[in-house]
C-alpha cells in the first residue's frame, strides 16, 4: 500500500520524528481523499489536479503558514514517488504557496495584451481556450470569478453578448467582441471533443480532463503569459 511505503520512507529514509511523519501522512491523506472524491489517481495526479486541490483547500485555510506546510507535504509525497520511480515527473514542482490573495492586473494596455497573446503556443491543445480566456477577461471586462462560473447557456454568440452573474447574484448583459466570439468558437470545437464531466456540462471553460477550471488555474494561466511577456 502506497501510504505504508510512504510512512517507511519518511521514517527510515528521511529520518523524521514520529510527529513529523504523522503530519506528512495527514497531508497525504487529505490529498488522497480529495483525489478519491474527484475520481483522480493520487499517484498520477497532474499539475492541474494539484492546483485545484490547493485552491480548494485555500478556501478553508486562513493561515498562509498552514497552507505552506500542507504544500510542503504535497511536495514531499511526490518527491517520494519520483525517487522510487512510481512517476517520471513531479507534478507538484511548480505548485507555489500564495504569498497574498491571488490577483490579476485590473488594467492592461492594448500593447501588453498583444504581448501576452503572442506568448500563447498555438501548437498546444489549450491554445484556443487560453486565447478566448484573455479576450473575455480583458475585452469584455470580466472578473476571474465570473469567467470561472460562466455557463454556456448564458453565452449568445450570434447576438454578441453574454449574461453574467456578478456579486450579490446580480445579473448583467455584457457584449462580446468579434475577436472574442471568433476565438471562443474555436475553443467550443475543441471543447466538444473532450470528455466533459457531468458537473461541468454547462461550464464554458474546462481543463483537458473535462473539469471546470478553478480561479487559481485561470490566474496561473494569465500570470505565466504575463511573465513570459515581461509584464
Where are these regions (language model features)?
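Conserved catalytic core of the tyrosine transesterase superfamily
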Residues: 1-231
Amino acid at each position: 500500500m502506497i501510504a505504508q511505503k510512504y510512512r517507511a520512507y519518511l521514517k527510515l529514509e528521511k529520518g523524521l520524528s514520529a510527529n513529523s511523519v504523522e503530519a506528512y501522512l495527514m497531508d497525504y491523506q487529505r490529498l488522497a481523499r480529495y483525489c478519491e472524491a474527484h475520481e483522480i489517481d493520487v499517484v498520477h495526479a497532474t499539475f492541474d489536479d494539484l492546483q485545484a486541490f490547493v485552491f480548494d483547500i485555500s478556501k478553508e485555510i486562513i493561515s498562509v503558514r498552514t497552507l505552506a506546510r500542507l504544500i510542503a507535504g504535497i511536495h514531499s509525497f511526490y518527491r517520494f514517488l519520483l525517487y522510487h520511480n512510481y512517476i517520471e515527473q513531479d507534478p507538484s514542482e511548480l505548485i507555489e504557496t500564495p504569498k497574498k490573495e491571488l490577483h490579476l492586473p485590473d488594467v492592461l494596455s492594448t500593447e501588453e495584451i498583444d504581448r501576452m497573446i503572442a506568448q500563447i503556443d498555438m501548437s498546444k491543445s489549450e491554445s484556443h481556450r487560453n486565447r478566448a480566456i484573455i479576450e473575455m477577461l480583458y475585452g469584455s471586462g470580466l472578473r476571474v470569478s465570473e469567467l470561472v462560473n460562466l455557463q454556456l447557456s448564458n453565452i449568445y454568440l450570434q447576438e454578441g453578448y453574454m449574461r453574467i452573474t456578478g456579486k450579490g447574484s446580480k445579473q448583467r448583459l455584457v457584449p462580446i467582441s468579434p475577436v472574442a466570439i471568433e476565438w471562443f468558437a474555436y475553443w467550443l470545437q475543441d471543447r466538444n471533443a473532450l470528455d466533459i464531466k457531468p458537473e461541468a456540462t454547462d461550464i464554458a471553460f474546462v481543463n483537458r480532463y473535462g473539469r471546470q477550471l478553478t480561479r487559481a488555474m485561470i490566474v496561473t494561466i494569465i500570470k505565466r503569459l504575463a511573465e513570459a511577456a515581461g509584464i
